[in-house]
Amino acid sequence: RPYLQTTYEASPLNRPVAQHGVGEAWVEHPVSYQYITRDPRSFSWLYYKIPSGNFLGVCTTDEDGNPAYEFKDGLGRTILAGRMDGSDPYFVYYQYNNHDDLVNVYPPFVTYPKMHEPEGPFDTQSSYSYRYDFLHRCVYKKLPERDAIYYIYDHGDHQVFSQDGEQRVRGEWAFSLSDELNRPVLTGICHNSYYYDDFPLCEIDVKARRDDTGTAFHGYIPENIPMTNPVVYTAVSYTHLRA
């Protein structure tokens, strides 16, 4: 059979319930979909500020009969995803803030604060954490077993600075500057003193202006921002074609 066959449910939602792969070998081994709802309070092993009401879930069973689950809330956001191994859950838990930004991701078997418990020494080293500014731009990113990375944006929505854990120890910021046409032209490090949560450049447009006298920046001069002990890693020049 040289075609893919999809079977849909008999409802106005027209959701797929089975999909048979190409070839006779898959006639009796389709990928099947089962749509379910579940109250989050029934998850005794996962109960941290989960919104009230039912999750909309889909159980996807592959050709070998292995089921995987994904549950979404009423806003279409994935809250739980994973599979069961007997009675053991292997689920990833996604947490959002009031602005629909993803703020925490807890992999399977990671300890996290439960409802009515104070914040404490939970296993944040094995989870993912994100923070955002008032424009929903990520300013803080924490990956498992890594120090957090900070990001600073200017008024023009450019990510100008970033800083990982090792750079923080050395007092360094990595910078990336664009020209007046928003083309990236300069990258490097500097020793400016910033705190990402203060949004220090939110009202400043940072540019790199072409100027052959700007020897420290290889033909550019940063505008509207001082640079402390800068070291340039890359400098890009663009040609100007005339008609």
Descriptions of predicted regions:
Residues 1-242:
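Beta-strand elements of repeat-based all-beta scaffolds
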